[in-house]
């Protein structure tokens, strides 16, 4: 499946084969975010100048120190709770586990508030799945600039959205 790096594709396939394809979109989301965001054990400033650590964690609780892997995973799980809650609360149409995964990584990056007001959500709730997916490609700006890294990320999210099952991941 074009657009998904081999390492991420292998991780998604492993979760799918383990039975995560039906109800385990959370683990696919974790794996996707680890790939898309990477893990930074030391705080840094992202492309928009926001202090960030671990797997895209931001906020006033960041300390200028080295974080452990376990701390990073705990922060990621905590950061994902409002994302999953937003999907459950705002999305009114059925989604495949892969669509939920793509949507969760998108919301993690753009924020729940932005998603809740987006054309993407309006299209999705109107049943326009392709139109909703295509809206992801518009979200490629940070700090007023178009970023290649965000374009690449959206390409991956859109490709995950299109996965139908394990056979797609084996290609």
UniProtKB/Swiss-Prot annotation:
Its EC number is 3.2.1.17. It is found in: Host cell inner membrane. Keywords: Antimicrobial, Bacteriolytic enzyme, Cytolysis, Glycosidase, Host cell inner membrane, Host cell lysis by virus, Host cell membrane, Host membrane, Hydrolase, Membrane, Signal-anchor, Transmembrane, Transmembrane helix, Viral release from host cell. This is SAR-endolysin. Coiled coil: none annotated. The keyword Transcription regulation does not apply. It catalyses: Hydrolysis of (1->4)-beta-linkages between N-acetylmuramic acid and N-acetyl-D-glucosamine residues in a peptidoglycan and between N-acetyl-D-glucosamine residues in chitodextrins. The chain crosses the membrane at residues 1-24. One of its GO terms (biological process) is viral release from host cell by cytolysis. It comes from Escherichia phage Mu (Bacteriophage Mu). The active site is at residues 37, 46. The lineage of its organism: Viruses, Duplodnaviria, Heunggongvirae, Uroviricota, Caudoviricetes. It is a single-pass type II membrane protein. GO terms for molecular function: lysozyme activity. The signal-anchor, which may also be an uncleaved signal sequence tethers the SAR-endolysin to the membrane until the latter is depolarized by the holin, resulting in the escape of SAR-endolysin from the membrane. Signal-arrest-release (SAR) endolysin with lysozyme activity that degrades host peptidoglycans and participates with the releasin and spanin proteins in the sequential events which lead to programmed host cell lysis releasing the mature viral particles. The SAR-endolysin is released by the releasin protein into the periplasm, where it breaks down the peptidoglycan layer. Pfam families: Phage_lysozyme (PF00959). One of its GO terms (cellular component) is host cell plasma membrane. InterPro entries: Bacteriophage_GH24, Endolysin_T4_type, Glyco_hydro_24, Lysozyme-like_dom_sf, Lysozyme_dom_sf, SAR_endolysin-like. Belongs to the glycosyl hydrolase 24 family. The gene is lys. Induction: Expressed in the intermediate phase of the viral replicative cycle. It is an enzyme of class 3 (hydrolase). SUPFAM superfamilies: Lysozyme-like.
């Amino acid at each position: 499946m074009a657009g998904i790096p081999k390492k991420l594709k292998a991780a998604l396939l492993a979760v799918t084969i383990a039975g995560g394809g039906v109800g385990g979109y959370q683990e696919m989301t974790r794996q996707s975010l680890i790939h898309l965001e990477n893990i930074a054990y030391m705080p840094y400033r992202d492309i928009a100048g926001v202090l960030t650590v671990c797997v895209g964690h931001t906020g006033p609780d960041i300390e200028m120190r080295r974080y452990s892997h376990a701390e990073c995973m705990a922060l990621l799980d905590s950061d994902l709770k409002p994302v999953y809650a937003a999907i459950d609360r705002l999305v009114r149409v059925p989604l495949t586990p892969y669509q939920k995964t793509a949507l969760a990584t998108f919301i993690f990056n753009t924020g729940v508030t932005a998603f809740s007001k987006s054309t993407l959500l309006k299209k999705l709730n109107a049943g326009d799945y392709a139109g909703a997916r295509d809206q992801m490609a518009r979200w490629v700006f940070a700090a007023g600039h178009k970023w290649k890294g965000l374009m690449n990320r959206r390409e991956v999210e859109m490709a995950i959205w299109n996965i139908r099952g394990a056979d797609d991941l084996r290609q």
